[in-house]
Amino acid sequence: MKTSLRAVAALVAFLLSLLPLEARVTRVEILSRGDVLGGSAFGKAGVYERLTGRVYFSVAVSNPHNQRIVDLDQAVNLKDGQVEFSADFIAVRAKDTRKSNGSLLLEVPNRGRARIMALVDGGNWDLASDAGDAWLMRNGFSVVSLGWQWDATGVDALKLYAPTARENGKTIEGLLRGDVMPWKPMSEIPLGHLIQAGIGGTEYPVAVPDDPRNTLTVRDWRDAQRTLIPSAEWQFAQIVDGKLVPSNRHIHLNGGFEPGKIYEYVYVVADPVVAGLGFAAVRDFASYAKHNPDAIVPAERVYGEGISQNGRFLRDLLYQGFNADEQGEMALDGILAHVAGAGRGSFNYRFAQPSRDAQPTSSVFFPTDIFPFTDQPGKDPVTGETGGLLDLSASQNVTPKIFFSNTSYEYWGRAAALIHSAADGTSDVALSDHVRIYHFTGLQHFSGPFPPQKGAADGLGQEPQSPLPIKYFWRAMIADMDAWVRSDRPPPPSSYPRIAEGTLVTLQAYAWPAIPGVNRPHEASTGYRLDFGPNWRQGILSIEPPKVGPLYPALVPQVDADGNEHDGVRLPEISVPLATYTGWNLRDPSIGAPGERLAFEGSYLPFPRTPADRQKSSDPRKSIAERYSSREQYLGRFAQALDELIKQRWILPEDRRAIVHRGEEEWSEVTK
């Protein structure tokens, strides 16, 4: 009898081991595990460990919360009403999870790169030898970076492993489009979307190289007329060992590609990946962490974090209703979507291209900056379409606390004004109680280096980049979000330019001071009314390139006599300035198209040192000597401005010394 009972108990234990860890996370595979910095203790949470591996998921096709996933019902691995997929992860958690603060920061990695800990804490992104000041760990946070992009490039990229789709067992074909503006003469270009040293997405190879629907065009700027390049002048090929050989991932052009021109290609592709499962991965991992006590990173609260591409991903997750899990419960309790502007993205389409954004001279006319833009319902006066970003989450009662934060660049390069203004550009709009919008003035998309310097290669601009740091705002935002969700302590109020106050204006009203030798832009990015065919709202794009309708209005922050923006959250470098910081930087003539804006970059324009310098250069801005009688006076005013930011909870008190030091460094830099 005892033997029989033991056998039954063993069988029950075995069967339990086969059950999913949670309804939609079926298992977790840990590939590596180790203590952070040799077992060093971090605050009350003590020793932290870093884990890598893969999470396995399964979703029910019939569940209403999954039915927006494009082609889910056509997945090749559909079995018994379920579709399985998996995703890479990196987790950093207290070794004794009971010592954590209960809050999980769930990073949606930008093109597969886990970077939030390096950004917030400093040090190595992988904590290999340097954890910076370990702010996140000292404060007990858990951090997970989860793959969601199926085609992320790079050996270290965190990826989504999703099935392809077939229609009744037959191959699905379609048209795919890409574009590029070379920064130097090139004989060939790779298919896919690659930015800044090969980061991006591989996208799809050409399926039928000789199909007459494959086209290549060239034009001089975004809205210029396309010129068709004869098919005899180009082919899908690349040079290998001095010989031209066929390639399904490259285009070779006789005579080469010229810098400063936009080349756009359309070609036939096959076997679409069910890319929308990336939304399900983020959603279901968040729910798993909150509801399964045996989760690898158990949490009471989960905050989705995304920067740029992944900030757009989080905006789209909200819009498409993916913050409700399969049980209808809230997945993410808070969302920090940074530098997403007005964008969403190509995340849940047939033949989705998740790396594509909307840069000034590439990734043009993609389904990125598309209506609706505001969190509350609005109306497009041209199309008559109505809606808001939070419509579905509100109807499902799963709207999280939200920070939409942007820098000066997003108003010029990502149409950020559309998130808080009417679609006709004539008025401000009210925000949801769940939302805060923060505009960090003078910063660029990604913080530039200090001392300031120009970019390189395709990032070479006419001016040095804006060096203002985002790090300190990030730390305060995470602390504010945690307090808002945990104890309902309101965060700082929204801070952004407004039409009613005259601080959000048209390009014609932009009061830029005429600084000698500095070229200003005469256009800014905005949203387009696009038509990709009759089924594109259901995720199937059939017209490439799309039909383009009227543009949405372009509005930008107004500036003062120095060229610095009036409204928003102003670092002391803006309140007590030594320079002008902009959200734009024009392309250097050496890389072509010198009248166009660079992607991602702002400008740093120091004031003249003395009245004599000012007079010599005819600079309209006051000199440093006319503003400040001494270094001590400057630093005193700098500290006062900083203390006001700390009082208003934009900056943490512990970061005061580091920011004052930056003020000291900038004074030394501009007065040397």
Predicted regions and their residues:
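N-terminal secretory signal peptides that target proteins for export/translocation
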Residues: 1-5
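Bacterial N-terminal signal peptides
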Residues: 9-18
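Sec/Tat signal peptide C-region and signal peptidase I cleavage site
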Residues: 19-23
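C-terminal His-loop and adjacent cap/lid subdomain of alpha/beta-hydrolase
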Residues: 24-672
